Amino acid sequence: MTAFKQGDPTTLNRLYGRSIGKPLRTHQQHLVDNLLPQISPPAEGPVTAERLFGEDCPLHFEIGFGGGEHLVYRADLLPNHGFIGAEPFLNGVASCLSQVEEQRLANIRIHNGDALEVLDRVPDGALTMLYLLHPDPWPKNKHAKRRMMNDGPVKMFADKLKPGGEFRFGTDHPVYLRHALMVMRRHTDAFEWVVEGPSDWQNRPSGWPETRYEHKARTKFGHEVWYFRFRRR
Ligand SMILES: C[S@@+](CC[C@H](N)C(=O)[O-])C[C@H]1O[C@@H](n2cnc3c(N)ncnc32)[C@H](O)[C@@H]1O
């Protein structure tokens, strides 16, 4: 994750965590070499629906999509919406590219790198939805500034979402949960927590599929998972 530095509106411009794992299979490498450049957002300038998809459409952004299960599910569900996913871990990107190819999804753009670099270039008020699912927890206090949920990024999330737009956040990590809610309490001027009672954060909302990461958290580690929806005021 990138870290927030006081006085820096976005990030330290530094990635933490791994960006490559085991070697890619031949076809995955082919997709990274050929499909990825075709569906990457432009390296410079504004990141708009018109530039990415050739027309105005509701824009969604997923930060750290892992293997892309959620991104692909959402894009398939909403074919007339445009989806941008950012993920620095190349093996995750390769897995997402395979799904994009198999399902012939024309409404996904993928950035292999830091989400905040691309999000920063999305015009203010342009996003309909923003997703942050199971961000790296950085559980030690001394690493708290590396967490994606910090005042700088959250301020940027607020800027990029349109009024009525939604920020979805999920975690299975109790330390991150407490930290995230503390941060969000500082941004109640921008975000309204869409909640009526505990079942709202204990049960997965419809249209929010389980990722492989989440499945493992539940079944292998016995973790609870918490779901949050925040509406941009
Ligand atoms: C615990 S995984 C969760 C993956 C996925 N969201 C899921 O729920 O399955 C956290 C992901 O965030 C990614 N990540 C870390 N820093 C990031 C950054 N600055 N921008 C985008 N993604 C980042 C990691 O590479 C990793 O894939």
Curated annotation (Swiss-Prot):
Active site residues according to the UniProt entry: D136
Pathway, per record: tRNA modification; N(7)-methylguanine-tRNA biosynthesis
Any GO CC annotation of this UniProt entry: tRNA methyltransferase complex
MF GO annotations: tRNA (guanine(46)-N7)-methyltransferase activity
EC number annotated for this UniProt entry: 2.1.1.33
Keyword Nucleus: no
Keyword Lipoprotein: no
Protein name, as recorded: tRNA (guanine-N(7)-)-methyltransferase
Species name: Erythrobacter litoralis (strain HTCC2594)
Biological classification of the source: Bacteria, Pseudomonadati, Pseudomonadota, Alphaproteobacteria, Sphingomonadales
Gene: trmB
